Amino acid sequence: MSFRIEKELTTHPLGKLGLPGNSLDKLQLLCDARTMRELDRNAIENIGIPGMVLMENAARSFTDLLEQEILSKNPDQLVVVCCGKGNNGGDGFASARQLANRNYRVTVVHAGEAKTEDAFKNQQIWEQFGESVSFPSSDA
């Protein structure tokens, strides 16, 4: 099975954040969420790449970019990682762990218990490292 990513590129909304000295304004959307889910599913089911490997690779790429574009200029900055309940939350826990391993100050705010096995595993790994997870109050 092959996938075609549309050539039409759209400027990503993150580029409008205006963070000083970064290249997020150059970030472009290459595919939509539905296409990305299909690519992930294909990698897992047809190629045999475990979901945890995909999460780890995504987290490493994000962590490298964050370090290069923002944290290298302000290494003492607290990084707050907001994790949802799905696989993006799992990516967040993996990114938080990688940032902590690189000696950055990190805290995680999580929407609740993970709904997927891989996301839950990354949450457990984060907690086994002795790190805490903040759950926002329902009153917020």
Give names to the regions the model predicted.
Residues 63-71:
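Generic structural signal for well-ordered alpha-helical scaffold segments
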Residues 32-38:
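Active-site-adjacent bridging/hinge elements
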Residues 41, 59-64, 97:
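Residues within alpha-helical segments
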Residues 36, 54-58, 88-91:
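Generic hydrophobic secondary-structure packing signal
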Residues 43-46:
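Intrinsically disordered, low-complexity polar regions and short flexible loop motifs
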Residues 49-63:
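A glycine-rich, Thr/Ser-enriched phosphate-binding loop motif common to dinucleotide/cofactor-binding enzymes
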Residues 1-31, 71-140:
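Glycine-rich phosphate/dinucleotide-binding loop and adjoining beta-alpha-beta core of small-molecule
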